[in-house]
């Protein structure tokens, strides 16, 4: 039975909601035999020839690994010489499968914070079912056991927690300690200093309307850095209690004796989106004579080694990485593989001048490169493709949106034939940049079968600096859909596909994109995949972490912003099939998603069904906001989605 009282769907684990979700999910899966595709995807995800990405801590390189025998994963380590050898010998530190079985818990590994310098203790984060909320437990790397709380071991109950080591017996912690300790978004509002065996002492308190408060301890300079996130794009920072007097919309990064800034609007001669640096002491004494390190390209990310700053930039969505010597600011451009996107995957001031870079493209598998003090890169590992890439190429096109803005998109496939089924991704929010990247899953299930894949760079992302994002927030949010529609129309105009051959797909904010497209311009495509979406935008700020996103979407309690949101909120713009026929939609979510509430997906699927529109629904019982918690779940969900797309817009050419 599809019909249900919508309010019942707000309760994550209530019997009526779970029964409704399970029955509809089972019906969706039953219509599609995904076993063969699932098996092939799972084999690629579990393959031993994948690259084990590493992080250096002292003399060891650490890695977390999942495969067919270890579905929940192994936390392990090795030496550099062994890692670079043809066959690597790994030392297992924690077997999460064994732990979950021993404790009868649905544990998902969420990371480890290891005690700097000695590297013999860790604060392990474990999630039930993949949720953002974690339990934190102290782990002894020498005995390979958790430290008993009765013996002074640090243990923090399940919550959205952040932690940082100060020394062997002291940590900084922000967690849910009850009323008055978390923000309206559900994140820590306080930071406390906790000494082993003693009580916590609060050192900083934010405000309920903040997104979060966090702190870290710099073991090199022996100082505490506290950050108060006012919203998603504004924050304030204190170093050992001293406020850094920069604008709220300016990212401030204190490092060693310098202060690096990335302003979203011009500040002290540093242009919006640029990168500036000044002596930290001089700044605190009133100096504002910044040195501009980068202003000609979009700064995508920063990373530090012992003696250098690594700057990753984008120019027309093409990657460059520079190594800049600290203090002299002498710059060396890294030589990256041709036609590849690259990003720094590991670097640390505590790991000398070593750093690691991953490079790939839509058609070229990932290469892992090791860098040194000279900026030279040496190949360490190279992953093979698990699908046939012959005949595939990528093109970049530019289109004009409704307000005249030009934006690019990539299209990948075999261009030797005519129009064919085309899958269009997209995100368009939160300053997230979409760059070319290799995916065995997409290759196996789509590209190898003859389909085109389109990746648009919509406004709202970070590909072209702060203004590329700020142009489409709050009352201008509709422009994201104008960009998306322009891309779909261009794909058709260039002869790549007819509208009925196009499927759109997006998750999270991308699920808002595709659900909004479904109700705004359904004539432009033939199917929509809507994953872990936001759809109920008139009350999103009251669900899970929704209050933290009001700087992006607007405040539904503000009359002007509410009026704007109401024009595009997907749930509130569903129309009956007698008025307009929507293409088929597949709506997916996870019961354990504690970031975007499953009610967004549940109520939207219900609204489509009640309107007589074609809709399928699938809810994974685990997985958190990622939608899947292990390779078995990923292969299950991905196979279902791709077979559903094939069923709706036609199987690509063999």
Tell me what each language-model feature is.
Residues 205-271, 280-284, 580-582, 587-613, ...:
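Long hydrophobic segments that form regular secondary structure
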Residues 76-80, 137-142, 187-197, 238-240, ...:
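Beta-propeller blade signature
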Residues 15-114, 125, 189, 212-229, ...:
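Non-catalytic accessory segments flanking enzyme active sites
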Residues 98-115, 126-131, 145, 150-152, ...:
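Cap/lid segment of the alpha/beta-hydrolase catalytic domain
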Residues 89-111, 123-126, 130-170, 174-185, ...:
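Asp-box/WD-like beta-propeller blade repeats and closely related beta-sheet repeat scaffolds
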Residues 164, 169-239:
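Solenoidal tandem-repeat scaffolds enriched in leucines and small polar residues
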Residues 456-654:
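Active-site-proximal cap/loop segments of hydrolase catalytic domains
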